[in-house]
């Protein structure tokens, strides 16, 4: 069991769901379900197993999981994931062994049937039911409750069920279309969970039968009520409308966004996509950018419908994507969006928890890193990252790790002063020069290693400043990310080369944490600066409102909308003269010309 798995096992939730074991290539080799993900997944890596399971465990290099809200959902999701991914260690379930549905036919005299094949044009379907025995019992229950046609006899010939009071196809009802439509609607209501009327009626009949000592009949009514109770279990993982949908949910925390997409095909949830990245603007804006880029990728099929959370503007998404956009308000569809949001939250929290646990597991990582790079043990590491959006409000940040732990009192922020427009190389040159000129001037302790969040270009710029301009001898490494914004490669040496670094090693986790931390720190500073600049620019030109008063307003109200909502007296309370406060309100509330 590698260190990555050890860390992730400690973070598993006590929830039902599905887990996906992966090999060294990231290929899914086994899909399973669990009532309790923590207990089930841990069991693979503890205790003895049979030969087959031992072989499976020997190939597991990583795992992921999807949280569901019930055991039934986990079971149904497992089937879909197995059919989609065909893992080599799973018993592969064929399509003809799919779960049964209950069907009301569209015939003149409708019938109730159990079927495993869904054809939307010839009836209304309910299910699927993971227990085929339960589906049969439900069908029997419906036969006893609703007098649909139950045989293939011609309409002028009565059948056995007619004499039991369970078939009205041979009575005067047979020519009454309204009767059959009403009966069909009653079943729909019943199978959709609106069964209180029937349950109440059966309860009264049960009590009445018991009062008259008809205990067998009372028991029959009791059994019917219990069968109805079984039917009340509803699934959100599969929908009988057979539509193709993508379901989006997202969660943000600590400057990071996680987006989860559930892919529903033919009414079945078959796969999900998870992506985590730092966000720069308001979360809603960056989500819109993400969803636009998502469907620009030709590998992503555009479905009939896309479900999005409530806080996203549906018209904007529809303009970007070009298909029907739905913000579910209630019921199963809303719960499916909520499930995507829940999984996004869980995934993001797991990322942070892993990083937090990594902090406590850095024993030996620093020494190993020094040995790997052939440098003295890097006790003090200083890392740099730039942040800008199309050149606006460019900033940089430095974080410091001492003995593998962040030393936040040593963190530094930099506003880029000499660079115009988006130029990461020039920005890096300025920041490195400013930082280490100060180190020389003030006699500060230089770091044992400088880490640049970037590739060959940024590292060479930093080396030129350190060695050629300042005459220092400090090792410099670069950390490159992949297209998913994850730590990917370590660059070091002269000339620069990729250093082989096991992804499950402690030194990899240390560098991963450093890169994430400097990125987070830079993004947070950039966002704060942009917000402050936006705030100040809207207040420019108002007579009597100088830098100090703007600062007072910013400190008290935090945002322009809060000032717009404030009363004049609230603004005056901040130390702003009444005439200036009135001018401010007038300026902010006047429509743009």
Swiss-Prot record:
GO terms for biological process: nucleotide-excision repair; SOS response. Residues 196-231 form the UVR domain. Residues 14-91 form the GIY-YIG domain. It is found in: Cytoplasm. Keywords: Cytoplasm, DNA damage, DNA excision, DNA repair, Excision nuclease, SOS response. One of its GO terms (molecular function) is excinuclease ABC activity. GO terms for cellular component: cytoplasm; excinuclease repair complex. PROSITE patterns: GIY_YIG, UVR, UVRC. InterPro entries: GIY-YIG_endonuc, GIY-YIG_endonuc_sf, GIY-YIG_UvrC_Cho, RuvA_2-like, UVR_dom, UVR_dom_sf, UvrABC_protein_C, UvrC. Pfam families: GIY-YIG, UVR, UvrC_RNaseH, UvrC_RNaseH_dom. It comes from the Bacteria. CDD domains: GIY-YIG_UvrC_Cho. The UvrABC repair system catalyzes the recognition and processing of DNA lesions. UvrC both incises the 5' and 3' sides of the lesion. The N-terminal half is responsible for the 3' incision and the C-terminal half is responsible for the 5' incision. HAMAP family: UvrC. Belongs to the UvrC family. Interacts with UvrB in an incision complex. This is UvrABC system protein C. It comes from Streptococcus agalactiae serotype III (strain NEM316). The lineage of its organism: Bacteria, Bacillati, Bacillota, Bacilli, Lactobacillales.
């Amino acid at each position: 069991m590698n260190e990555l798995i050890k860390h992730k096992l400690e973070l598993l939730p006590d929830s039902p769901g599905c887990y996906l074991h992966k090999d060294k290539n990231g290929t899914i080799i086994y899909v399973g379900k669990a009532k309790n993900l923590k207990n089930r997944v841990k069991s693979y890596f503890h205790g003895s197993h049979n030969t087959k399971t031992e072989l499976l465990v020997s190939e597991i290099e990583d795992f992921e999981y999807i949280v569901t809200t019930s055991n039934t959902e986990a079971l149904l999701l497992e089937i879909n994931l197995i059919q989609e991914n065909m893992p080599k260690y799973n018993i592969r379930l064929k399509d003809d062994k799919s779960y049964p549905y209950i069907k009301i036919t569209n015939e003149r005299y409708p019938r109730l049937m159990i079927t495993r094949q869904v054809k939307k044009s010839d009836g209304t379907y309910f299910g699927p039911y993971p227990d085929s025995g339960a589906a049969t019992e439900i069908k029997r229950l419906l036969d006893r409750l609703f007098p649909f046609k139950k045989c293939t006899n011609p309409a002028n010939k009565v059948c056995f069920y007619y004499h039991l009071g369970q078939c009205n196809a041979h009575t005067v009802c047979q020519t009454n279309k309204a009767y059959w439509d009403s009966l069909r609607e009653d079943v729909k209501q019943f199978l959709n969970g609106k069964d209180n009327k029937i349950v109440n009626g059966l309860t009264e009949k049960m009590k009445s039968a018991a009062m008259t000592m008809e205990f067998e009949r009372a028991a029959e009514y009791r059994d019917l009520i219990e069968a109805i109770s079984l039917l009340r279990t509803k699934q959100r993982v599969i929908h009988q409308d057979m539509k193709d949908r993508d379901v989006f949910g997202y969660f943000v925390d600590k400057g990071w966004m996680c987006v989860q997409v559930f892919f529903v095909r033919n009414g079945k949830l078959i796969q999900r996509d998870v992506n985590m990245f730092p966000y720069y603007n308001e979360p809603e804006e960056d989500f819109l950018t993400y969803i636009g880029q998502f469907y620009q990728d030709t590998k992503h099929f555009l479905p009939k419908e896309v479900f999005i959370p409530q806080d996203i503007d549906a018209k904007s998404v529809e303009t970007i994507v070009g298909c029907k956009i739905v913000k579910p308000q209630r019921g199963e569809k809303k719960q499916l969006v909520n499930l995507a949001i829940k999984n996004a939250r869980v995934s993001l929290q797991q990322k942070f928890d892993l990083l937090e646990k990594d902090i406590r597991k850095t024993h030996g990582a620093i020494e190993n890193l020094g040995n790997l790079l052939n440098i003295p043990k890097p006790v003090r590491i200083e890392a740099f990252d730039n942040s800008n959006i199309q050149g606006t409000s460019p900033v940089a940040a430095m974080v410091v790790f001492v003995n593998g732990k962040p030393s936040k009192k040593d963190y530094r922020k930099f506003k880029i002063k000499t660079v115009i427009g988006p130029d990461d190389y020039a920005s890096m040159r300025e920041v490195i020069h400013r930082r280490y000129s100060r180190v020389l001037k003030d006699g500060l302790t230089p770091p044992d290693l400088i880490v640049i969040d970037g590739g060959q270009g940024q590292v060479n710029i930093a080396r030129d400043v350190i060695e050629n301009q300042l005459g220092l001898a400090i090792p410099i490494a670069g950390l490159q990310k992949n297209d998913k914004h994850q730590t990917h490669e370590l660059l070091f040496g002269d000339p620069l080369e990729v250093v082989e670094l096991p992804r499950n090693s402690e030194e990899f986790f240390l560098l991963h944490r450093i890169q994430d931390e400097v990125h987070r720190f830079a993004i947070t500073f950039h966002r704060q600066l942009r917000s402050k600049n936006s705030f100040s620019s809207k207040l420019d030109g108002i007579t009597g409102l100088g830098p100090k008063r703007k600062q007072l307003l910013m400190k008290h109200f935090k945002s322009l909308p809060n000032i717009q909502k404030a009363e004049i007296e609230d603004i005056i309370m901040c130390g702003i003269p009444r005439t200036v406060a009135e001018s401010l309100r007038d300026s902010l509330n006047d429509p743009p010309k």
